[in-house]
């Protein structure tokens, strides 16, 4: 498990917001944690895959799309806050994200 520092958290949050602002052609100042990816931004699951690909390259993450898919089936990332929280977990747990919350 990787350590998720406050600096990395800020960096990841900025990446998520910048990504959705650019991809959805929305001013970043109009985005907030409650912004719905689908309803407010007309986003889709392919955007999340593209975002994960960016994070994989930036942080050398070892994660399979299947692992992300399994996690998202149980924990949908519907708002920007949930996308940010999911990307934090991806950074920390990589493929083990599917086991997060299990005992």
Curated annotation (Swiss-Prot):
Keyword Transferase: no
Any one GO BP annotation for this protein: fatty acid biosynthetic process
UniProt modification remark: 4'-phosphopantetheine is transferred from CoA to a specific serine of the apo-ACP-like protein.
GO CC aspect terms: cytoplasm
Keywords for the protein's UniProt record, in alphabetical order: Cytoplasm, Fatty acid biosynthesis, Fatty acid metabolism, Lipid biosynthesis, Lipid metabolism, Phosphopantetheine, Phosphoprotein
Signal peptide bounds: none
Family matches, as PROSITE patterns: CARRIER
O-(pantetheine 4'-phosphoryl)serine found at: 45
Domain Carrier, residue spans: 3-87
InterPro entries: ACP-like_sf, PP-bd_ACP
SUPFAM superfamilies in the record: ACP-like
Record bears the keyword Lipid biosynthesis: yes
Intracellular or extracellular location(s): Cytoplasm
Task of the protein: Acyl carrier protein.
Protein name in the entry: Acyl carrier protein homolog
């Amino acid at each position: 498990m990787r350590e998720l520092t406050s600096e990395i958290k800020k960096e990841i949050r900025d990446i998520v917001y910048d990504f959705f602002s650019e991809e959805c052609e929305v001013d970043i100042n109009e985005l907030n944690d409650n912004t719905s990816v689908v309803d407010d931004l007309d986003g889709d699951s392919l955007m999340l895959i593209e975002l994960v690909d960016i994070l994989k390259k930036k942080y050398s993450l070892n994660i399979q799309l299947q692992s992300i898919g399994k996690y998202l089936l149980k924990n949908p990332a519907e708002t920007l806050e949930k996308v940010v929280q999911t990307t934090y977990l991806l950074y920390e747990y990589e493929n083990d994200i599917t086991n997060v919350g299990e005992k």
